[in-house]
């Protein structure tokens, strides 16, 4: 039977998947044929010959004309719907039809209509989201003038114009820009998660055209380049123009998903559009997501089919035996039909007749009821005011209505870093200068007090201060004003030692272009404290120091590298002193200090430990005054190393080390890589709920690790954090095995051969068993090492090692690698996964996970459009999972348990009745009762239970994350629970048949007339059944609302109203062939034994459920039962107000600004390519 699930999973695919797969197949076929892309600028006619796709994106499933056939085709993929369609055809065969055709048609039409309307509403929302992106405007060059067109209409070969802060419309070749040398600054946070500005440069032949529309319009260059691919950092091709050929690489290409920054305008030639862009190539395949409960229901429906077939077979055999033993006595007045020649023939026909009679074993309203429940729970998410983000006026949004209960079963969360855990904001928080810390708030008595707005330093005395900058320690301002020499050197170092460039976008307004966000924060801080970096040239740096312009001659920039983890500048002061200023990682600078700084360095290191314990990013600042003669000797060595062709970088590093020694320590800085509000608390809470969190980011390793410590994914109390940094397969394998051996020495070094064989067959029902480590560990792996670890032979090693860790950080990842990691856990762990991110680079993992969550940000909506749920802040995730997810799962499980039970109890009465009617496929109930049972009589109470049930207050759900655990292990509804429902239904059907049978057998009314007729018996059974079902739903409800009362007791009352109507003289006399229970209700319900039967049957049916609910928590309790008992005890006291406890960060890890810096930017500065005119003239304008 374990293979049936896999079989049913294969069956449950839908047409949207099929259509999208066919479209992707056509795209793949076209790309295989396209070995080289060829296009001409400004020549749509030529480019149209290649049938390149347009620039639109599509996430919707249906169109206006194909909605009805596609939606019906999709709905009939569900086994139950297909079953009832087949059943309808069977009912049209008179030889076997035992029920009227409308008993199936009416419910089937209602079910299909409700689901169709819901699907249509969902798809309209997707259409609107697509239009929001596709209908954005962009400027395009047409016949020598700039025109506005929609994004969807952009074609390959068009020349488009982008301005500052505009998103890039399509992958395009940069032609020219407003910046010198055709440079353009871009932000790629949506692609790789990095907030650093990056520089792209146009080739010289096109950058000379600048914004000359005549030249750009006449440009007819031909580009030959790679066909569409998903490699973000790879692009090669040639540009043929005016008889010359120019080489192209990825430095010339602007990718869709980037945002233009600090560049007034730029022009680009569109190379890839729509689905061909590298962003969309990395977005992964769209799949129709179904929950684990959906797959389980398909398996259970197959079980029901098998059980139904078995019963029909037994009943048909019983019919054959009965016909041979007793049936011939009845043939005198009820002869066989002409098409029945023997008892075997009759048995064969009876098989199908019972197949129709017992059809309610497969509940026709199951799927539509599930959809209604999911829709209702989705609205709870949309309406949740506690997930509403007021600054952006954005509520949480359930973008799909099919995954709500899956939110209550998540075991792995895969999170992006930039923009998801962090706010993309770096803030100068604290510093240490000459052994004294600044940045804490103190009262008049010198006692530490929390920061408050009233303690904010007033920088109004400095007209060049950045109004957005905040600082809360006035003593630092006083130290600056008192002209303390070391404080002066500290801020002078920060204002000179950087690669920031300044720009005056509006006259008198200074704007910084920071290649590293850390540097931007530092330079902004020095600006507010009176040391204003104003401008630079290749030879000078101009600083306004406390209102005075000072020009420093730039002698050398000792550039950053990953190995050096520091940078230095050498300048000549106006007083003709040669000074070296250096800043970098504390562990590096510490080794370069002069021995006289020993005591100061120890104090500063203590301060750095304090800063790091708060999760701040730290670095050290130092200087050295150089002897002029020594410097002249050194600069010659530097020049020789610079001109070397072989091992230039190595030789430059040695020259740098020669002069970066005997440094004098100035102090240290602490920058807050600002986490979103509540991130550490959320992660701690989710960890208590046994949810593992992996960070998948494109950012650098040190930055990612630092954030992992800040948000409590990694903790100091861990037994170790393993770094997998291998650059070849063997090294990566060895590092993974070494880590696993340390975590669990008895763990097999060699993977189980059987598991390895099954691992290569993902379609097999295979699950990797959990291995528990002997301690708490973390794992860090880079994208380069991940490329080897994700190979077929190593991926299982990676999975085993990573899943033994409490936290995992994967850095320097491509979007495709993110999806591969998520898929790896999905395939082998068989758990529910959730991916959360905010950028276009997160789309692939959002699509790959069972549940995709998009963080809505100001820059882009790509991740949100591809997500299943969206909101604005990461800390809303705990509410989404622990409140909405848990409740949705609990409600769905209660619904399914009751739904299957009530259908079994209802249907199996026919089984017992067969033994008393000669196995003739006659029904116990009135035909209208069969039609209305699932649609009217029992639908509203169970919907009320499924939409309003709440076992505990939402505050308790957040206070006790352990309540989430049953959903992770699928304890509340599984195959075992289904069997219990079946047994419960069998028992109840037995009671519901034989107790009324005993009541009416040989019974008389008060007037002496017999009441043991079929119609009276039928009415008694169905009335008893409705009474029992009402009490069952009441017993299962723990949270009563007015709606629950109305639905539960109102449905009972509605049954009696309809019963009286159907038995009324008006209907029965006018339509006797349809309504044939004339006066039965009036006569039967007036008898006391009928009501005594109802009470007795209800008590007998309720006893097992009451006993089980009482004994199970006592004899077989789970952790959630113990927590619930604790909560029920605490309910005697007021419900606690949930307070987010401030998490302290005891981590002693420190990371420097250099980790988010890009090597080689110093050389770009000294080349002068990034610089504009007259630095001194510009500086004077700020005085």
Swiss-Prot record:
Keywords tagged on the record: ATP-binding, Cytoplasmic vesicle, Lipid transport, Magnesium, Membrane, Metal-binding, Nucleotide-binding, Translocase, Transmembrane, Transmembrane helix, Transport
Membrane topology per record: Multi-pass membrane protein
Top EC group: translocase
BP GO annotations: Golgi organization; phospholipid transport
Binding site for Mg(2+): 416, 418, 838, 842
Top-rank taxon: Eukaryota
Reaction(s) the record says it catalyses: ATP + H2O + phospholipidSide 1 = ADP + phosphate + phospholipidSide 2
Residues binding ATP: 416-418, 519, 560, 583, 617, 697-699, 812, 818, 841-842
Transmembrane segments: 96-116, 299-319, 348-368, 904-924, 927-947, 981-1001, 1014-1034, 1049-1069, 1090-1110
Disulphide bridges, residue numbers: none
Tissue-wise expression: Highly expressed in testis.
Main location: membrane
Subcellular location(s) of the protein: Cytoplasmic vesicle, Secretory vesicle, Acrosome membrane
Protein name: Phospholipid-transporting ATPase FetA
Native species: Mus musculus (Mouse)
Gene designation per UniProt: Atp8b5
């Amino acid at each position: 039977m374990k293979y049936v699930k896999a079989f049913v999973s294969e069956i449950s695919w839908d047409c949207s998947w099929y259509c999208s797969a066919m479209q992707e197949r056509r795209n793949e076929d076209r790309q295989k044929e396209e070995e080289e892309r060829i296009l001409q600028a400004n020549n749509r006619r030529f480019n149209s010959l290649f049938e390149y796709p347009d620039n639109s994106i599509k996430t919707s499933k249906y169109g206006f004309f194909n909605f009805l056939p596609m939606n019906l085709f999709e709905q009939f993929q569900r086994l139950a719907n297909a079953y009832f369609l087949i059943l309808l055809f069977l009912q049209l065969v008179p030889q076997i039809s035992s029920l009227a055709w409308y008993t199936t048609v009416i419910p089937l039409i209602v079910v299909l209509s409700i689901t169709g309307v819901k699907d249509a509403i969902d798809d309209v929302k997707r259409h609107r989201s697509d239009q929001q992106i596709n209908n954005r405007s962009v400027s395009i060059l047409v016949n020598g003038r700039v025109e506005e067109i929609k994004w969807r209409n952009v074609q390959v070969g068009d020349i488009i114009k982008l301005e500052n802060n505009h998103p890039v419309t399509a992958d395009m070749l940069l032609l020219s820009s407003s910046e010198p040398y055709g440079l353009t600054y871009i932000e790629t946070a949506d692609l790789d998660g990095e907030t650093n500005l990056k520089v792209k440069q146009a080739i010289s032949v096109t950058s000379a055209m600048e914004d000359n529309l005549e030249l750009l319009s006449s440009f007819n260059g031909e580009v030959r380049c790679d066909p569409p691919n998903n490699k973000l950092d790879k692009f090669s091709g040639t540009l043929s123009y005016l008889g010359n050929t120019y080489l192209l690489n990825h430095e010339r290409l602007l990718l869709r998903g980037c945002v233009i920054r600090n560049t007034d305008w730029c022009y680009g030639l569109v190379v890839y559009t729509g689905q061909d862009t590298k962003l969309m190539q990395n977005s992964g395949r769209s799949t129709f997501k179904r929950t684990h409960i959906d797959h389980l229901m398909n398996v259970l429906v197959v079980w029901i089919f098998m059980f139904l077939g078995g019963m029909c077979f037994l009943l048909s055999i019983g019919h054959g035996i009965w016909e041979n033993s007793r049936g011939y006595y009845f043939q005198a007045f009820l002869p066989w039909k002409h098409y029945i020649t023997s008892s075997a023939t009759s048995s064969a026909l009876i098989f199908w007749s019972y197949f129709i009679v017992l059809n309610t074993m497969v509940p026709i309203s199951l799927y539509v009821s599930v959809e209604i429940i999911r829709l209702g729970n989705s609205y709870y998410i949309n309406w949740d005011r506690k997930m509403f983000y007021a600054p952006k006026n954005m509520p949480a949004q359930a973008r799909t209505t099919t995954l709500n209960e899956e939110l209550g079963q998540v075991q792995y969360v895969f999170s992006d870093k930039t923009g998801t855990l962090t706010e993309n904001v770096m803030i100068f928080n604290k510093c240490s200068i000459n052994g004294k810390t600044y940045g804490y708030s103190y009262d008049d008595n010198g006692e530490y007090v929390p920061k408050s707005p009233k303690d904010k330093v007033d920088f109004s005395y400095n007209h060049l201060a950045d109004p957005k900058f905040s600082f809360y320690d006035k003593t630092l301002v006083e130290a600056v004003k008192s002209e303390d020499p070391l404080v002066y050197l500290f801020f002078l170092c920060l204002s000179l030692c950087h690669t920031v460039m300044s720009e005056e976008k509006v006259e008198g307004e200074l704007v910084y272009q920071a290649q590293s966000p850390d540097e931007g924060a530092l330079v902004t801080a020095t600006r507010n404290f009176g040391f204003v970096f104003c401008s630079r040239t290749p030879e000078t740096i101009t600083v306004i120091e406390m209102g005075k312009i000072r020009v420093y001659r730039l002698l050398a920039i000792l550039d950053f590298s990953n190995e050096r983890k520091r940078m230095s500048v050498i300048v000549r002061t106006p007083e003709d002193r040669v000074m070296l200023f250096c800043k970098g990682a504390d562990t590096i600078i510490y080794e370069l200090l002069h021995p006289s700084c020993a005591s100061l360095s120890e104090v500063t290191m203590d301060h750095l430990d304090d800063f790091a314990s708060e999760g701040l990013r730290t670095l050290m600042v130092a200087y050295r005054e150089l002897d002029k003669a020594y410097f002249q000797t050194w600069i010659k060595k530097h020049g020789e190393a610079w001109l070397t062709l072989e091992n230039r970088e190595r030789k430059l590093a040695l020259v740098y080390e020669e002069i970066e020694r005997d440094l004098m320590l100035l102090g240290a800085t602490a920058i807050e890589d600002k986490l979103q509000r509540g991130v550490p608390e959320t992660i701690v809470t989710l960890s208590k709920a046994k949810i593992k969190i992996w960070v998948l980011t494109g950012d650098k390793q040190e930055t990612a690790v630092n954030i992992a410590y800040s948000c409590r994914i990694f903790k100091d109390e861990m037994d170790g954090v393993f770094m997998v940094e291998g650059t070849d397969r063997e090294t990566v394998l060895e590092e993974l095995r070494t880590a696993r051996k340390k975590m669990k020495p008895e763990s097999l070094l060699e993977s189980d051969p059987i598991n390895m064989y099954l691992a290569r067959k993902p379609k097999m029902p295979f699950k990797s068993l959990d291995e528990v480590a002997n301690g708490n560990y973390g794992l860090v792996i880079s994208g380069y090492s991940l490329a080897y670890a994700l190979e077929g032979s190593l991926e299982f090693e990676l999975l085993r090692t990573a899943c033994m860790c409490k936290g995992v950080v994967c850095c320097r990842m491509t979007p495709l690698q993110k999806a591969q990691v998520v898929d790896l856990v999905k395939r082998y762990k068989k758990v529910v996964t959730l991916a959360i991110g905010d950028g276009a680079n997160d789309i692939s993992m959002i699509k790959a996970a069972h549940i995709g969550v998009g963080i809505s940000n100001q820059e882009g909506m790509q991740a949100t459009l591809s997500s299943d749920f969206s909101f604005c802040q990461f800390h809303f995730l705990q509410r989404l999972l622990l409140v909405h997810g848990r409740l949705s799962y609990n409600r769905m499980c209660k619904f399914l348990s009751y739904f299957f039970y009530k259908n079994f109890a209802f249907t199996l009465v026919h089984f017992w009745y067969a033994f008393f009617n000669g196995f003739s496929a006659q029904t116990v109930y009135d035909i209208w009762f069969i039609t209305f049972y699932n649609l009217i009589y029992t639908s509203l109470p169970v919907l009320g239970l499924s939409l309003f049930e709440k076992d505990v207050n939402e505050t308790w759900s957040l206070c006790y994350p352990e309540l989430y655990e049953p959903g992770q292990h699928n304890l509340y509804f599984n195959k075992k629970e289904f069997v219990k429902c079946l047994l419960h239904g069998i028992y109840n059907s037995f009671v519901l048949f034989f107790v009324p049978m005993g009541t009416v057998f040989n019974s008389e009314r008060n007037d002496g007339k017999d009441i043991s007729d079929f119609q009276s018996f039928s009415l008694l059974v169905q009335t008893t059944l409705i009474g029992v079902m009402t009490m069952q739903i009441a017993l299962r409800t723990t949270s009563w609302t007015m709606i629950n009362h109305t639905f539960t007791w109102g449905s009972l009352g509605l049954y009696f109203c309809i019963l009286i109507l159907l038995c009324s003289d008006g209907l029965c006399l006018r339509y006797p062939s349809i309504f044939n229970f004339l006066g039965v209700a009036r006569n039967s319900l007036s008898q006391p034994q009928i009501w005594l039967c109802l009470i007795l049957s209800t008590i007998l049916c309720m006893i097992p459920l009451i006993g089980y609910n009482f004994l199970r928590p006592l004899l077989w309790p789970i952790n959630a039962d113990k927590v619930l008992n604790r909560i029920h005890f605490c309910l005697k006291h007021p419900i606690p107000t949930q307070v987010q406890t401030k998490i302290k960060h005891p981590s002693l890890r420190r990371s420097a600004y250099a980790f988010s810096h890009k090597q080689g930017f110093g050389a770009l500065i000294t080349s002068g390519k990034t610089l504009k005119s007259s630095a001194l003239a510009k500086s004077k304008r700020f005085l």
